[in-house]
Structures are given as C-alpha cells and as structure tokens.
Amino acid sequence: SALSGRKGHIAYATTKGAVVQMTRCMALDCASDGIRINAVCPGATDTAMPMSKHSAPISRERLLENCRQSIPLQRIADPEEVVRSILFLASEDSSYVTGTTLSVDGGTTA
C-alpha cells in the first residue's frame, strides 16, 4: 500500500507511504552516526491478516487463489521469505544500504 494505490484505502495507504518517507529522512539524519535505516514492504503473505480484512465469508483457499492470480510470481509469500529480507537488511551483508524500501511482493510493484 505504500508503493501503489488501492481504491478505498486512503488512510491505510497514506500511513504506509509516510513510513517510506520517514525511512528516507531518518536514513539521512542517522547516516553520520553509522546507523542504517531501511524499510520492508511485504506483499501478500500467508498469514491470518488477509482473512481478517474480509467481512463477507470467503474460503481461505479462494482468497489465496485470488491473490495468486494478481501476483507476477503466481504465489503468496511464506512469512519466512519476508523474515529473510529483514535479516538481510539488518546484517553486514547490506552494510552499504540505507534509506531504501525493499519490496518483497513477488513483482506486484514492478
């Protein structure tokens, strides 16, 4: 929601977009102290959250299939995939990365 719009989600998308800008500004503010600031924007992930967004009854399988069809990689992320991206940004392997927003979304925002 931070990197793309969606009808009926103005408040949610606005707050997510603010996190992207906050990440950039904080990265600049903290760089001289050797502190790196980055953000991760996960796409559809196999958690309970997508089910909680729907007021109409829908089966988990149907919801996941609907999501899969809109994702270029044609699958939902496993939570561990999102965790690994966060661990990468927290590690020394990304020591020259700051102020970035990493999309972990199967190509949805490509």
Provide a role label for each language-model segment.
Residues 12, 20, 80:
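Catalytic tyrosine of NAD(P)H-dependent dehydrogenase/reductases that use a Tyr as the general acid/base
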Residues 44-70:
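A glycine/serine/threonine-rich, flexible loop-to-helix segment
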Residues 1-4, 26:
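Active-site segment of SDR-like NAD(P)-dependent oxidoreductases
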Residues 36-46, 90, 103-105:
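Conserved SDR Rossmann-fold cofactor-binding beta-strand/turn motif
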Residues 15, 23:
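Active-site helix of classical SDR
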Residues 75-104, 109:
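C-terminal substrate-recognition "lid" of short-chain dehydrogenase/reductases
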Residues 28-32, 95:
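Alpha-helical segment proximal to the catalytic Tyr-Lys
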Residues 3-9, 31:
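Active-site "substrate specificity/gating" loop of NAD(P)-dependent dehydrogenases
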